[in-house]
Amino acid sequence: MNDKKELKLILVAARNQLSSNDIKSLIAYLESDDCEFEISLQISEPTEQPELLELHRLVAIPALIKVSPAPKQIFAGSNIFSQLQKWLPRWTQEGLTKNLGINLQPSKIDSIRTQKEFLLEDELLVLRQENETLTKRIESQERLLRMVAHELRTPLTAATLAVQSQKLGQIDISKLQEVIKRRLEEIELLSQDLLEVGTTKWEALFNPQKIDLGNISAEVILELEKFWRLRNIEIDTDIPSDLPSVFADQRRMRQVFLNLIENAIKFSRDSGSIKITMIHKTNQWVEITICDKGAGIPLSEQKRIFLDRVRLPQTSEGTSGFGIGLSVCRRIVQVHGGRIWVVSEVGVGSCFHFTVPVWQGQNKEQQYLTKG
């Protein structure tokens, strides 16, 4: 025989509020055997039942309404569960004390005061949440600005090298014009990114399509030829002829290759070697590896180098640099749904690995793009 008193409740909350710890704890308790009442709980979405707000004169949500037994009582704010726990023992005693004339019901004045307190508490909570959101947005915009500024360096450097090569007679005027035109187009695209920083999410700036990573890596190697030939560095590639195309943003993938190969050249010893390998490990991903025989990276630094504003370790030749390029690589790869990591040993060298999704006829609804 069930001797529990029936308690009819209505929980008015938005969908996102139902995932808060307070509301989850409240629902779990009401559905458990620990509750001393026979609970009838109705969960209502205010946008679907706006009449509840007027009917119960709710001034804030989430709100828990005790419909029966009478009188009606309302709890609101971010600590509804703890409020309910304070009142449950009093409701339990109501039946025992009713015949003695003891009134344990909240007065109207107390109820109004409590509602105002809850409203102020909720407004403070909203202000804190808005402040956190604004702070995160500013940080995201600053990070994106640093990335775009870093990317601007690449076409500017390439254009400068082309001008120098033309002066030395290594390329003719038509080739110089072609290079300058292509680099100006890249700068124009980057300037568009800058204009969209305040209104666009990082992943929305990507345009994934079917691309050939082998061709992209070959273009980057040629673009950096002056740097690796000057230091007598040999670059070997191991790319299968049947390597599938991938689904990625061509400009961003080129940036990843530029950053990683440029770093490999920068931190390699003179007359050293760099190897670029691509393998089709599964039907979902292509894995790219870029290895050098440079100074290597200490184990303690290997997890940090992909973070913003981290300085790479110094080589024996005194070369050092900021790791924003690796941060850019990490975010680009992650937006495509892939992974990037490093395997390195001090004095032996470093191998940077990253994965890119295979082209499988993806359309806009099947994109791998995620938040970076």
Curated annotation (Swiss-Prot):
> Gene3D superfamilies this protein is in?
1.10.287.130, Glutaredoxin, Histidine kinase-like ATPase, C-terminal domain
GO MF, one term, reads: ATP binding
Which stretches make up the Histidine kinase domain? Answer: 147-360
Q: Which UniProt keywords apply?
A: ATP-binding, Biological rhythms, Kinase, Nucleotide-binding, Phosphoprotein, Transferase, Two-component regulatory system
- This one is known as Adaptive-response sensory kinase SasA
Classification via PANTHER family: SENSOR HISTIDINE KINASE GLRK, TWO-COMPONENT HISTIDINE KINASE
Q: Which Pfam families does the record associate with it?
A: HATPase_c (PF02518), HisKA (PF00512), KaiB (PF07689)
Q: How does it assemble?
A: Homooligomerizes. Interacts with KaiC. Participates in the KaiBC complex, whose core is composed of a KaiC homohexamer and 6 KaiB.
- Class of enzymatic activity (EC top level): transferase
> What EC number(s) does this enzyme carry?
2.7.13.3
Report the residues modified as Phosphohistidine.
H150
Entry text on domains: The N-terminus interacts with KaiC, while the C-terminal histidine kinase domain autophosphorylates and is probably responsible for self-oligomerization. The N-terminal domain stimulates the C-terminus to autophosphorylate.
Role according to the record: Member of the two-component regulatory system SasA/RpaA involved in genome-wide circadian gene expression. One of several clock output pathways. Participates in the Kai clock protein complex, the main circadian regulator in cyanobacteria, via its interaction with KaiC. KaiC enhances the autophosphorylation activity of SasA, which then transfers its phosphate group to RpaA to activate it. In addition to its output function, recruits fold-shifted KaiB (KaiB(fs)) to KaiC to cooperatively form the KaiB(6):KaiC(6) complex (independent of SasA kinase activity).
* Family matches, as CDD domains: HATPase, HisKA
Which transformation does this protein catalyse, written as a reaction?
ATP + protein L-histidine = ADP + protein N-phospho-L-histidine
Tell me the superkingdom of the source: Bacteria
Q: Which organism is it from?
A: Prochlorococcus marinus (strain MIT 9301)
Output the InterPro entries linked to this UniProt entry: HATPase_C_sf, His_kinase_dom, HisK_dim/P_dom, HisK_dim/P_sf, KaiB_domain, Kinase_SasA, Light-responsive_reg, Sig_transdc_His_kin-like_C
The GO biological-process annotations, alphabetized, read as: circadian rhythm; osmosensory signaling via phosphorelay pathway
